[in-house]
């Protein structure tokens, strides 16, 4: 018999994550690597676990994640968004706690573009009055 799995897609900055949740022991695999090997910072790994903590399902599901684009922070945010959406498929009653924690909202903040005549998006060369 086919194993039950729940899917979710998450995005953050320039990252996009496809998440599959399967009932298991709580292992998280990102791009075929354990999360401890893929993300070297504990504080950023905590971001990925937030949906499980909010819904008190930590250790009940294994997450298989394919994530592309961006850096550690963006990828962790995209994964968090995808896990939250997949948990909604598991149980629609999770919508309340996930929504209150702000985990179902796509974070629309993006990198500001560089403007012509400036060094970066807002950094200008030093102004000399005389």
Swiss-Prot record:
Gene3D superfamilies: 3.30.230.10. Residues 101-130 are annotated as: Disordered. Keywords: Ribonucleoprotein, Ribosomal protein. InterPro entries: Ribosomal_Su5_D2-typ_SF, Ribosomal_uS9, Ribosomal_uS9_bac/plastid, Ribosomal_uS9_CS, Ribsml_uS5_D2-typ_fold_subgr. Residues 111-130 have a biased composition (Basic residues). One of its GO terms (molecular function) is structural constituent of ribosome. The keyword Ion transport does not apply. One of its GO terms (cellular component) is cytosolic small ribosomal subunit. GO terms for biological process: translation. Belongs to the universal ribosomal protein uS9 family. This is Small ribosomal subunit protein uS9. It comes from Levilactobacillus brevis (strain ATCC 367 / BCRC 12310 / CIP 105137 / JCM 1170 / LMG 11437 / NCIMB 947 / NCTC 947) (Lactobacillus brevis). The lineage of its organism: Bacteria, Bacillati, Bacillota, Bacilli, Lactobacillales. The gene is rpsI.
């Amino acid at each position: 018999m086919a194993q039950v799995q729940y899917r979710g897609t998450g995005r953050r900055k320039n990252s996009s994550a496809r998440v599959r949740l399967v009932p298991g022991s709580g292992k998280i695999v990102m791009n075929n690597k354990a999360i401890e090997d893929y993300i070297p910072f504990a504080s950023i790994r905590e971001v990925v676990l937030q949906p499980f903590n909010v819904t008190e399902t930590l250790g009940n599901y294994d997450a298989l994640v394919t994530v592309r684009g961006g850096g550690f922070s963006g990828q962790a945010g995209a994964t968090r968004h995808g896990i939250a959406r997949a948990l909604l498929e598991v149980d629609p009653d999770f919508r309340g706690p996930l929504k209150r924690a702000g985990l179902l909202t796509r974070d629309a903040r993006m990198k500001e573009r560089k403007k012509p005549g400036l060094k970066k998006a807002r950094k200008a060369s030093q102004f000399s009055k005389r």
